[in-house]
């Protein structure tokens, strides 16, 4: 076992796997934001290139650019928030999987943790941004499908 760890080919393979994983993360985090809509207090963008479908569920990164500064539960000011939502296409529900505020617009500046513990599934009201995301992407052939 110890000789395998120091085998140059094994080390090269391990490095390539790590570089590939880092590259995939960087690619998804550098995908362009596409404007999706507007709310009374924010402009909403999605990262279309990183939408994933797993069965009846979608994972979508959403960016909110707030018109006014907001305050986090830890009393830190932020101007934008990036949230990974999971959407249930059958039951029209959403759940936050990850959420960060940023001091500047478009997810720039210092990152502030906004995710609550054990975020609940939320029923999406008609005409909400979440419902529009389901309508736009649940039936879309553009979404990346993963079979698990």
Question: Which residues make up each language-model segment?
Answer:
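Bacterial N-terminal signal peptides
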Residues: 10-20
